[in-house]
Amino acid sequence: MALFHVRMDVAIPRDLDPKVRDETIAKEKAYSQELQRSGKWPEIWRIVGQYSNISIFDVESADELHEILWNLPLFPYMNIEIMPLTKHGSDVK
């Protein structure tokens, strides 16, 4: 498995049809919760005061992460930063 730290900043256009906005957000929530339940998205944290999150993904590869992110319904409205992670030599676990 490969771990990734992912920051997602969302910027939905103000002129987006409200119905489309609501449907997209509902689809995003369902998709992300499915990934959380599967263990592929074990951590998600809101950044206070922003429409942003910091997430940890536990996936097979960078290719799998790419597919997951591209399938996010809000992907077209996101700026995403990805950092691959590895175990730290001083970790006591």
UniProtKB/Swiss-Prot annotation:
Its EC number(s): 5.3.3.4
Keyword Cell cycle: no
Gene3D superfamilies with a match to the protein in the record: Dimeric alpha+beta barrel
Pfam families membership: MIase
Pathway(s) where this gene product acts: Aromatic compound metabolism; beta-ketoadipate pathway; 5-oxo-4,5-dihydro-2-furylacetate from catechol: step 3/3
Domain of life: Bacteria
GO biological process, one term: beta-ketoadipate pathway
Keywords: Aromatic hydrocarbons catabolism, Isomerase
Position of the signal peptide: none
InterPro entries: Dimeric_a/b-barrel, MLI_dom, Muconolactone_d_Isoase
GO molecular function: muconolactone delta-isomerase activity
Catalysed reactions listed for this entry: (S)-muconolactone = (4,5-dihydro-5-oxofuran-2-yl)-acetate
Membership in a protein family: Belongs to the muconolactone Delta-isomerase family.
Complexes and interactors: Homodecamer.
Protein name: Muconolactone Delta-isomerase
Native species: Rhodococcus opacus
Upper taxonomic lineage: Bacteria, Bacillati, Actinomycetota, Actinomycetes, Mycobacteriales
Gene name linked to the record: catC
